[in-house]
Amino acid sequence: MTIYTGSGVAIVTPFFEDGSVDYDTFGELIEFQISEETDAIIVAGTTGESSTMPDDEQVAVIKFAIDRVAGRVPVIAGSGVNDTAHSIRLSKEIEKLGPDALLVVTPYYIKTSQQGLIEHFEAIANSVDLPIVLYNVPGRTGQVMAPETILHLSQHKNIVAYKDAVGDIAHTLAVRNLVGDKIDIYSGNDDINVPIILAGGKGTISVLANVYPKATHLMCKYALERQVDKAFGLQLKYLDFIHMLFAEPNPMPVKKCVELIGKSACHYRLPMTHVAPTLATRLEQEIARLNSLQGE
């Protein structure tokens, strides 16, 4: 099964200055995304700062998103943490809320073997009756899930998709070559959204979409339709800005940008903190430049 095609936003979680969740603003961000044709909402992932949330709060944030979206687009909920038993408990609790799928990251800090990854994901997949998106992000976890491991896991009935945040199109091609259509691939790196879709991907799980949701939707739409010139035109138009979004650790820059476009105050939970003033200025200037351009 395909959960969605196109642009899924890895949505930020807005906080008040005291660190509590700003649910009113969160609802407004969800409405902004849907109004701009975002194809799916990914909540409580890396960009949503789920690693700073206790389980009960993460569940509450996910429940709020599911209730607010009310079936208009798919909601994928982050449920992976760095040990298997905890991931199972959290996944089962989130399953009760009715998300369309779970996003499960490879264990971080606790590095294991490829066989350990297989057993970890199979144990989680066996514990729930929901589609699971594997999430491979070695820049945050310190470990790459190998294409052969993804092939093995694709045989499980509940493991239906793969978020590729390795940042190397050669890895994506290796996965595609091995796995074929057994599992859907989503880009986890906005700077190669179009190449991954042209390599057979179904779309993106995007940080960029927090700031430019319509453009990200169109970028994916054109790539899926094989309107290559239009797709690459948008990929290249936003490329410098995408790189700025990762000039400091995500989601620090993107939350600043969400503030700059007037959608949310910029508050974090430590150890996340405000970007350097020089980067804040560059982000503001680039947003102004992009907004001054004609077209999509």
Language-model region placement:
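Catalytic alpha/beta core domains of metabolic enzymes, predominantly
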Residues: 126, 140-246
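Alpha-helical structural signal in soluble globular domains
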Residues: 60, 64-69, 93, 97, ...
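C-terminal alpha-helical cap/extension of soluble enzyme domains
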Residues: 3-14, 32, 36-38, 93, ...
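Active-site beta->alpha loop and helix N-cap motifs at the rims of alpha/beta catalytic domains
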Residues: 2-9, 13-142
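Alpha-helix N-capping/helix-start residues
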Residues: 17, 23, 55, 147, ...
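Secondary-structure boundary/capping positions in well-ordered alpha/beta enzyme cores
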Residues: 72-73, 131, 160, 182, ...
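Glycine-rich phosphate-binding "P-loop"
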Residues: 136, 158-159, 269-270
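A general structural signal for well-ordered alpha-helical segments in protein cores
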Residues: 26, 58, 62, 87, ...
